[in-house]
A protein has these predicted regions:
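Solvent-exposed edge beta-strands and adjacent loop segments
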Residues: 1-78, 129-150
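Hydrophobic membrane-targeting and insertion signals
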Residues: 2, 220-223
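Intrinsically disordered, low-complexity segments enriched in small/polar residues
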Residues: 3, 20, 27, 77-79, ...
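Polar low-complexity intrinsically disordered regions enriched in Ser/Thr and small residues
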Residues: 8, 25, 32, 82-84, ...
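Structured, beta-strand-rich domain cores
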Residues: 54-125
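An exposure/low-complexity boundary signal
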Residues: 97-99, 218-221
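Mixed-charge, glycine-accented linear interaction segment located at domain edges/termini
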Residues: 130-210, 215-216, 222
Length: 223
């Protein structure tokens, strides 16, 4: 399956005890992603043959290419504080990175366009619990030819209390994909998005269940 599109980077803070999500927000414009899972590699041999093998996933990283690292979005996610600075007659607020910052746990998901010789799909990828890491910055002075630098942010993948670390589903339409993605946050698709894709959110075919992943019967979503 070939990938030919990427969009809809969404996130919401997660309550660690209840594993329910807050408001869903856009992280940034999507440019690229790369998932790197951490796996066990334990093996037991006896009588000259492999008897036990453990390759279970224990976590991982996800690198996200984004079009904007808006500090009003990323600073709170990184657990950064704020400081007031006096500038003439004005008092301005600046974000403060500190060695004691503790990033917030969030759920994160996006939609990937995929295509083969038979059909095109919109695939939902959802990570129920991640944290974002402080990221490096770089830039150049203006030159004769424009050379745009876009940021890359890295998330650390965690499992929920039941061990779930990722959900995905291949959908036939963008509206179905949005419905699944918002359902995994425990939400419904905003009306303006539903109208943009030509249907109402209260349609029986597109209205997602208002449940969070740990409480949702995922057979309904992943079959």
């Amino acid at each position: 399956m070939a990938t030919n599109g990427l969009s809809t980077y969404l996130y919401a803070t997660i309550d660690e005890k209840t594993e329910k999500y807050g408001d869903v927000n856009k992280l940034a414009g999507a440019i690229s992603y790369k998932e790197s899972l951490t796996k066990n590699s334990a093996k037991v041999y006896s009588d000259n043959v492999l008897k036990i093998s453990d390759s279970s996933v224990t976590g991982g990283k996800i690198d996200l290419g984004v079009d904007d690292d808006d500090p009003d979005i990323f600073s709170p996610l990184l657990g950064q504080g704020k400081k007031n600075v006096k500038v003439g007659d004005e008092t301005l607020t600046v974000n403060v990175g500190n060695s004691n910052d503790v990033p917030k746990y969030v759920g994160f998901g996006f939609i990937e366009n995929e295509k083969n010789d038979k059909a095109a799909y919109h695939t939902v990828n959802f990570y129920p619990k991640i944290t974002f890491e402080p990221y490096d910055k770089e830039g150049n002075t203006k030159q004769e030819n424009n050379d745009y630098k876009t940021p890359t942010v890295t998330g650390t993948i965690y499992g929920l209390n039941n061990g779930d670390y990722k959900y995905n589903r291949r959908c036939k339409s963008m509206l179905e994909a949005l419905s699944v993605l918002y359902a995994l946050f425990g939400k419904t698709v905003p009306t303006e998005l539903a109208e943009q894709y030509g249907k109402e959110t209260d349609s029986p075919e597109t209205n997602p269940p208002e449940t969070n992943p740990p409480e949702t019967d995922l057979e309904e979503i992943t079959e």
